[in-house]
Amino acid sequence: MVIRILKLARSAARLILAAALVVGACRASLAQGDADLEAPGLEPFAAPVSSGTTLFQNVRIFDGQSATLSAPANVLIKDGIIARISANPIAIDANAKIRTVAADGRVLMPGLIDAHWHAIMASTPQMVLMTADPNYLQLVAARQAQATLMRGFTTVRDLGGPVFGLKRAIDEGVTIGPRIYPSGAFISQTSGHGDFRFSFEVPRVPGGQLSHSEAEGIAAIADSPDEVRLRAREQLRQGASQIKLMAGGGVASPYNPIESTQFTEPEIRAAVEAADNWGTYVTVHAYTPRAIRQALAAGVKCIEHGQLIDEPTAKLLADNGIWWSLQPLLDDEDAPPLANPVSQQKALEVFAGTDNAYKLAKKYNVKTAFGTDILFDARLTTRQGAILAKLVRWYTPAETLKMATGDNGALMALSGFINPYPGKLGVVEEGAIADLLLVDGNPLENIKLIADPDKNLLVIMKGGTIYKDIATK
């Protein structure tokens, strides 16, 4: 018996030692920050064309702020930053390894920014999203991230979904894609727009198993200020750059009227306080004046959608310097696929309000961001640039492109000291991050050039690294 006990003790000791080694290895891996990409079989599946120093010669610049193009100029990119812009030739060291792009007078502009994106949900049908293996969904999202970058969108603000791993993989060069400002799981009340539970997952049992959508990190359900605060802090712990709450009814969710106001002011304020302590902000999904006004009273700094807004509430947004992240949602070829008749009817209500919303945003000079909010359809993702081009129904091409570059860049900076990409985005100026597009043609005259990125985007650069170059012979 004693011998047996000694053997068991030795086995236990070996297990403890092995566990310690595993924990140590995990900590070492986390400390290093990325995988060993030099190891066989771990090369990035899509390598960039070139990185390092790049010189763009003879470009006309749309800087993300002005309404006109610059005179012919030269732009030097070094260490991922726009190092110099000059009307005169920029001297370079003959021995230096510099990639030169002869632009021949083409337009250099900032990379596009989509302020309302869902990397996990954009190209996956809703029922697949709710039932498929999470690993499959991540692989689909990685493929879509590459396509997003190749459409010229160098940054996205992700407003719901488990994208922390995808963001890390992109940042570390494991795969390619845009910069991601992640929200993590969107926070919803029970029966709210983010409550996608199946009928067998209701009622909620205190301390019970999470629903499928919660376990995947798509949604987080909370029903008190304390629960909202907890869920917000969980997203911040994982690396959220802003917090997303569902403050009103939605289209794709079957269990709530679109006119409903969701959460209470104290519940929303709990998330605002948690975000503010982290130096960042809360944005909310809301369509109606009542939902928007309650969110503003709680300290929210950004409204998503808002198509059912009224004029006094639009003026309130302007008077308080609130961001309005608005999407050109219309009853056209870009309408999302919705099988549920209830959702279809709610979508028509939203579509009917879009024109008025943009007119009010422009009338009161509200700080307006551009986003697509593409959901559940791979075909629609290919039209990301075409959806941006629709804004010329209300804005000039210059105003449209400014919204999707310089203005959206200012919104990204609202994440304060937890900004995952410190520096200036969305502009072409010395010292800014070198996220750039070289366009074959003038998008200030023909914005539809953006809708055909394969043909018209000759160079796509993110952080000084070129991912596409069909301009250099």
Residue ranges with predicted function:
Residues 38-42, 46-50, 61, 66-109:
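Histidine-rich, glycine-flanked metal-binding segment
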Residues 2-16:
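Bacterial N-terminal signal peptides that target proteins for export
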Residues 98, 106-172, 190-199, 266, ...:
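Metal-associated gating/positioning segment near the N- to mid-region
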Residues 277, 352-443:
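His/Asp/Glu-enriched, well-ordered alpha-helical/loop segment
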Residues 183, 190, 246-356, 367-369, ...:
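Active-site core of metal-dependent hydrolases
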Residues 28-33:
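Boundary at the C-terminal end of the N-terminal hydrophobic targeting segment
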Residues 162, 171-294:
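Histidine/acidic-residue-rich, glycine-tolerant segments that coordinate divalent metal ions
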